C-alpha cells in the first residue's frame, strides 16, 4: 500500500526541481532555434555597425537614462473580482455594458501563482516571487526555501541609484511590502520586519518612502500615553517612530498633517518619509472615514510627487521604483464580503488611473505593471440558491445597498450586545432596524436569520460570517473558501515609450510564472539580484523568542487572521 506525505516548507513541489534557483528557460523548439539564430546574427551585425558608428546607436544596458517603475499588487484579486467590480460599477453609475475599468484596457497576460511547497500560495511566497524572482515556501518573507535571505528588486534598485517606495492599505509590515524590504523566516515576525524597513540590517536604509497602516509595530506594547496611538505591539520596548525621526525620517501619522502633503502633491515631503495612518490596517473603503484616513489614490499622489521631485533634484538619480498594493481586496475575499471587495477593487482602479495619467504626462521612461499574488475566496459571480434549476443571474444592487463591511458591523453589534446584555428585545430590534435594514439594506430577512444572529450573542467572527453570507446569498455571489485558490491571475501593463512597450509585451504578454514578473522588473531596471543576495547573507532573519514565545506569536497571528477568515 502506497503512503503519501504532505509536503513541508522544504519539500520541492515538483520532484527534480530546485525552487531556490532562478527558473530555467523554457524548452526551445527547432523553429525557435532558427529564429534565435537569426536574431543573434542580426544582433552581431548591429554591434558591428555600432562600432563603426558609435554615435548612431545606444545599447539598452549602457543608456543610463532615467526610468520609473510603478509595480502594483492587487492582493487576492482574481479575474472574477474584476468582473464583479466592473458590473457593479456599470450598475450603480448607470453605465453602458461596454464601459470597462481602467485596468481592463491594459490587460496583457496572466500569471501562475504556486509557491515552492504548495499549489496554493500565500501572500508572502507570492510577493517573494515578485521581489526575489524565485519560488519560496508559504510564509517566507524575502528568503529562499532554505531560509536564506534573497536580494530583492527594491534593494537592488536602491543600490543602483533609484529612489524607492512602498504604499499599501494594510500594515506596512504585512507580507507584500515586507517581502520587498526585509528578510525573515515567517511573515508573523512583523516587529523584526519593521526594523529592517528602517535600515537595521546589512544594507542599511534602502526604502525612501513607506506609507500605509501598521503603526502598532513601530512603538512599544502597553504605551497608553504614546503620542502615536494606544495599541503598540512591540515587545522589545523600542519606539521605532522616535528612532526614525532621530535618524532623519519625516514622520506623519494623522490626516491633518497628511493633507498638507496632499495639497502640494507631495512636493513638501522630505525623504526618507514614514507615513503610518492606522495602528493596524486602514479600514475598508466602504467603512473608511475620509476625514481620518487617506485613500490609496491620495497616498499614491503624495508618493509620486515626492519621488518625482527628489529624483529631478538629484542629478545622480536613475529614477524610482514604487510598489503600490491594493491590500484589502484580499481581506474582503477572506471574509467572503462582496460589498467590501467591489469597493476595494474600484478604489484600486482609481489609483491605477491616477498613476497612468502621471506616466502619460511624464518625459521619463515609465512602466506600470499590475498583477495579483493570488486569488482569495474562490469567488464566482453566480450562485445556486435553490434546489431547482439555477437562475443565470446575480444582483449588483444588493451590494450597492450595503453601506458597511461585515468587519465593521460585527464590532458594532458586539458593542451593542455588551452594552445591553440581557435586553433581548432591544438587541433584536437593533439587529433588525440598525444592522440589517439601515446598514445592509436587507428587508427580507427571515426568522431563521434573526434567530441565528441573536444566538450568536457576542461571537464576533460568526456574526461577521453570517452577515456577509446574507449579502452574498441575496446577490447570488458564490465563494468556495475563506482562504486562497490556485487560479491564474491577470497581468496588466503600460509603458509611455513605444520601444519600451514592445519590450514589456515581449516579456509579459501571455501566461507566465509569477517569478517571471520579478525577472522582468530585474531586467528592465538592469539590476543584479544575485549580487544583492551576496551582500545580505548575514541578515538576522530568525526570531529571538524561545519555542514557547514563538508558539504564542503564531497563535496571536493566527487569531488575527481568524478575524479575517471567519
UniProtKB/Swiss-Prot annotation:
Recorded E.C. number(s)?
3.1.3.1, 3.1.3.54, 3.1.7.6
Q: Name one GO biological process term.
A: nucleotide catabolic process
Write one Gene Ontology MF term.
Answer: metal ion binding
What the record notes about the co-factor is: Binds 1 Mg(2+) ion.
Pull one GO CC term from this UniProt entry. Answer: fungal-type vacuole membrane
Write out the catalysed reaction.
Answer: a phosphate monoester + H2O = an alcohol + phosphate; (2E,6E)-farnesyl diphosphate + H2O = (2E,6E)-farnesol + diphosphate; beta-D-fructose 2,6-bisphosphate + H2O = beta-D-fructose 2-phosphate + phosphate
Q: Which residues bind Mg(2+)?
A: 75, 174, 176, 325
The keyword rRNA processing is annotated on this UniProt entry: no
Record-listed Phosphoserine modification sites: 123
Summarize where Zn(2+) 2 binds, as residue positions: 75, 373-374
Q: Where does Zn(2+) 1 bind?
A: 330, 334, 484
Q: Name one Pfam family in it.
A: Alk_phosphatase
Where are the catalytic residues? 123 (phosphoserine intermediate)
Q: Name its co-factor(s).
A: Mg(2+); Zn(2+)
Q: What does this protein do?
A: Phosphatase with broad substrate specificity. A truncated (soluble) version of the protein is responsible for the production of (E,E)-farnesol from (E,E)-farnesyl diphosphate. Acts as a fructose-2,6-bisphosphate 6-phosphatase.
One further remark on this entry is: Present with 3060 molecules/cell in log phase SD medium.
Tell me the protein family, please: Belongs to the alkaline phosphatase family.
- What is the recorded name of this protein? Repressible alkaline phosphatase
Q: Which organism is it from?
A: Saccharomyces cerevisiae (strain ATCC 204508 / S288c)
- Lineage, please? Eukaryota, Fungi, Dikarya, Ascomycota, Saccharomycotina
Gene name, Swiss-Prot/TrEMBL: PHO8
